[in-house]
């Protein structure tokens, strides 16, 4: 019985991956908005209902890998060692190279470049991305509130979560911009993500009180 369940679960994972891979290929070839779910189902040799059983929306076919990111991010903050701050745990996780930036796979770099261009050209995908990160921010805020025993109505957990996720979103935008260039230098991009991300986090640690204050001459 256990063996049958194992085979069944593997079959489900294989089907899910097949659908995701098929969708990604078609989206890159034709553009996200030009590919209906029916075409994905036909290419993957499954029904439309099966596609939606695995992916609630067409947009989720693009962002399906982000579920694991959310789980791992929250775990990194929640399970941080004693004495480590929330911002330090967040930075340690977010600034760690992953995917293409860690492996340097040329095929992965091409896929990431193509996906970045596809997302940038699709209002539907950009809107879905905003929804996903809003959910992440809410989850992080809830974790921070619980971790700090914040009272109901305390805005600091939400403000902190928005600030931290703002750094992450800014780094994503930075990487996407770098991928639009002629030559993609993985080592340089990874180093800049770490350095620029740490700069942004350091700013949050120091506080915004004097950031951008003008001097007597009017300069910053």
Regions found by a protein language model. Name each.
Residues 110-138, 150-151, 190:
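Short secondary-structure transition hinges
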Residues 19-27, 73, 90, 129:
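Short hydrophobic clusters on alpha-helical segments that form packing/core surfaces
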Residues 6, 30-32, 45, 52-64, ...:
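HTH DNA-binding helix-turn interface
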Residues 134-160, 181, 212:
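Hydrophobic alpha-helical bundle segments that form small-molecule/ligand-binding pockets
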Residues 64, 71-115:
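Hydrophobic alpha-helical connector segments
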Residues 15, 69, 94, 132-136, ...:
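Hydrophobic/aromatic residues within well-ordered alpha-helical segments
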Residues 173, 177-220:
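C-terminal peripheral helix-coil segments that are non-catalytic and often amphipathic
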Residues 1-30, 34-46:
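Basic, helix-initiating cap at the start of DNA-binding domains
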């Amino acid at each position: 019985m256990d063996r049958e369940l194992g085979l069944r679960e593997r079959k489900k994972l294989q089907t899910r991956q097949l659908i995701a891979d098929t969708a990604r290929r078609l989206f890159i070839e034709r553009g996200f908005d030009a590919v209906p779910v029916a075409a994905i189902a036909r290419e993957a040799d499954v029904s439309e209902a099966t596609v939606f059983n695995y992916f609630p929306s067409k947009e989720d076919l693009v962002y399906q890998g982000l579920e694991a990111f959310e789980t791992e991010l929250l775990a990194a903050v929640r399970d941080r060692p004693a004495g480590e701050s929330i911002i330090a745990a967040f930075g340690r996780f977010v600034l760690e190279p992953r995917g293409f930036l860690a492996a340097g796979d040329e095929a992965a770099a091409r896929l990431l470049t193509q996906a970045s261009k596809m997302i940038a050209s699709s209002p539907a995908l950009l809107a879905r991305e905003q929804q996903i990160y809003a959910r992440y921010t809410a989850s992080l805020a809830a974790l921070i509130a619980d971790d700090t025993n914040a009272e109901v109505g305390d805005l600091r957990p939400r403000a902190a979560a928005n600030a931290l996720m703002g750094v992450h979103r800014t780094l994503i935008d930075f990487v996407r911009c770098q991928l639009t260039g002629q030559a993609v230098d993985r080592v340089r991009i990874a180093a800049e993500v770490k350095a620029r991300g740490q700069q942004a986090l350091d700013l949050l640690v120091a506080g915004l009180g004097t950031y951008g204050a003008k001097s007597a001459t009017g300069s910053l």
